[in-house]
Every structure is written in structure tokens, then in C-alpha cells.
UniProtKB/Swiss-Prot annotation:
InterPro entries: DapB_C (IPR022663), DapB_N (IPR000846), DapB_N_CS (IPR022664), DHDPR_bac (IPR023940), NAD(P)-bd_dom_sf (IPR036291). CDD domains: DHDPR_N. GO terms for molecular function: 4-hydroxy-tetrahydrodipicolinate reductase; NAD binding; NADP binding; oxidoreductase activity, acting on CH or CH2 groups, NAD or NADP as acceptor. It catalyses: (S)-2,3,4,5-tetrahydrodipicolinate + NAD(+) + H2O = (2S,4S)-4-hydroxy-2,3,4,5-tetrahydrodipicolinate + NADH + H(+); (S)-2,3,4,5-tetrahydrodipicolinate + NADP(+) + H2O = (2S,4S)-4-hydroxy-2,3,4,5-tetrahydrodipicolinate + NADPH + H(+). Pathway: Amino-acid biosynthesis; L-lysine biosynthesis via DAP pathway; (S)-tetrahydrodipicolinate from L-aspartate: step 4/4. Its EC number is 1.17.1.8. One of its GO terms (biological process) is diaminopimelate biosynthetic process. It is an enzyme of class 1 (oxidoreductase). The gene is dapB. This is 4-hydroxy-tetrahydrodipicolinate reductase. It comes from Citrifermentans bemidjiense (strain ATCC BAA-1014 / DSM 16622 / JCM 12645 / Bem) (Geobacter bemidjiensis). PANTHER family: 4-HYDROXY-TETRAHYDRODIPICOLINATE REDUCTASE 1, CHLOROPLASTIC-RELATED, DIHYDRODIPICOLINATE REDUCTASE. It holds the Pfam family DapB_C. (S)-2,3,4,5-tetrahydrodipicolinate binds at H156, G165, T166. One of its GO terms (cellular component) is cytosol.
Amino acid sequence: MVKIAVCGAAGRMGGRIIAAVKEAEGVEICGALERPGHPMVGQDAGYNAGLGAIGVAISDDLNAVVQACDVLIDFTAPKVSLKNLEVCALYGKSIVIGSTGFTPEERALAAELAREIPVIIAPNMSVGVNVCFKVLADVAKILGEDFDVEIVESHHRLKKDSPSGTAVRMGEVVASALGRDYNKVANYHREGICGERTHDEIGMQTVRGGDIVGEHTVYFIGMGERIEITHRAHTRDMFSRGSVRAAKWVVTAKPGVYDMQDVLGLR
């Protein structure tokens, strides 16, 4: 039985992960974390998950929770995730990170810490999205240089980072397949008289509004034809189920940084 702890247990995603753990076989929820001073600290974690009491209180003691688990699932923010990763490395525990918005320096620090423990860092835990990553790489290689690439992503009005980590990953996948450096060809800004589109650039557009869970479309635009590859998320449950699947996988992995492509055997 894999013992799972959840960081951000009082949030929307944390609640869905706890519910997914309770539904899954071979795993159990052993800990729930929140920041010190959060009003739900001390309350049963099952209430936020819509389950009623499950006998696991939300705690603000990171060290104690990590020591008691086999793997920590973290959907918070980069700085919090890195702190959690440091503590997991200290105690030899695995971690699954779904936070987005990491800087290159933060990614480098995560890779350094992953020399001690297996770490999954994935901008999107959905099986469907990760299949899309595979499809995008294949399509980009087939189409080559004859099609322009544009990405449009849409999320709810409360999302803090832009563009989404999933959209950036899609851009990285396409750029790599085309032999380009994503950081050099990504275009996040078009306004006024900005000149014609360059051949290599990958455009990125963001929509924020309402309660959109997540939608990503990659356009391959040629002369006289267009291919659109779209993934739409209707609920957060696919992310929570994916994170539990990742947690079950990572506890048997060797130290290093992995993502959902590894979990799903898509490499």
C-alpha cells in the first residue's frame, strides 16, 4: 500500500486529489498539508474533498507529514514546491509536482535535488494531454517547415500564471521536433505594427475568463489548409487521477527527474 500525502489539501485541486486517492486501489491518504495559519489546519481533510471525515487532519507540519508518507503530491507554486522537494530529499521520499511557472533556475535546482530521490515534474497530469504531446511531436516532424505553428490556451479567470505550463510544454515539444530552440522562437507579444510573422516563430496566445478548466489548441497552418489539435478538460478529476497514477509509479523509480511521458510509457 503506497502512503500518499497531499500538499495544498484545502484547495480545489487538493480536494480532488484526496478524493482520487480514496477511490484508487493500492494507495491510501496518510497526510494533508497546508500553509501555517490556514483556517482549515486541524480540520479533517475529507470535508474539502466532499467525503466527510476520513480520519486525516490537515497539518502545517511539513517535516512530520513527509516522514510519514511514501510520496508527496504537490500542486502549489514553484517556491513552495521546491521547499517541499528539499524536505522530501532530506527524508528520502518521492514527490510528484504539478505546479507550473518554474524558472530555468528553479528547474536546475529541482534537477540537483532529484539526484537523491525520484521526482515527477509535469505541467499536466492528464493522460489525454500527454498523448497530445506525443501526437504533436509526430505531426510537427511530418509537416516540417511548411506549416506555421500557433498555440492558444484558455483557463479560468483565477489562474495566476500565463501562459499555462501545458501550453509552454506543447511549444517546447513542437520546437524540439522541428530542431528549434523554443526560448528563441516563442512569441508572446503581438501588438501594433509589429511586422510580418517570422518563419521560425511559435506564437502563443492566452485567454482568461469564467470557469474554464483548461483548453489548448495547437494550429499547424499551411497555405490553403490548417490542422488543429485540441484538448479540452471538462473537470479537474483527470489531473487528480493522473497524479495518483504518477505517485504509484514514482515510488519504484530510480532517483532523477521524470514526467508523465515516463509514467505512461510514451518515450
